[in-house]
Amino acid sequence: MFNFDQLENIHLEITNRCQASCPMCSRNYHGGLENPLIKNQDWTINDFKHILNSEVLNQINGFYFCGNFGDPIINNDLAEMCSYATDVNPSLEIRIHTNGGARSKDWWKKLAKVLPNKHCVIFAIDGLADTHSLYRIGTDFDNVLKNAKAFIQ
């Protein structure tokens, strides 16, 4: 039986929007058409604060912004969510999984300032440019690399 006190890590889906049309993604079918059963929705910063209040944030070790049905960087409140969470519990570890194809280099530099070294962003890079273009349709390989470099520097 689940006991709330045992909760240590949380997997969050803060959006189900994505700029990519990856053929293996559940958001898409028949070669990239959007799945009509998945509605485009985002959590707001208020949703985040309500669900992950200070009691929850102080109990857990960390959380993952994952993109099973959307890419977390598409959510306009992502950086604010990260700031809020680390302000409440500075020992939290935040992990973000992304295709890395959205946003500008400046946005990525700002996110890097919000997330110091102990946090992690995982960029989905599927091979070199030719292979990447097959599996991450709607993203540009060179842009993903530029964004990753902007975040790292």
Residue ranges and their predicted role:
Residues A148-Q153:
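Short, intrinsically disordered, charge-balanced linker/junction segments flanking boundaries
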Residues M1-C120, L134-K146:
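Conserved alpha-helical substructure of the radical SAM core
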Residues L128-D130:
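Flexible loop/hinge segments that line or gate small-molecule binding clefts
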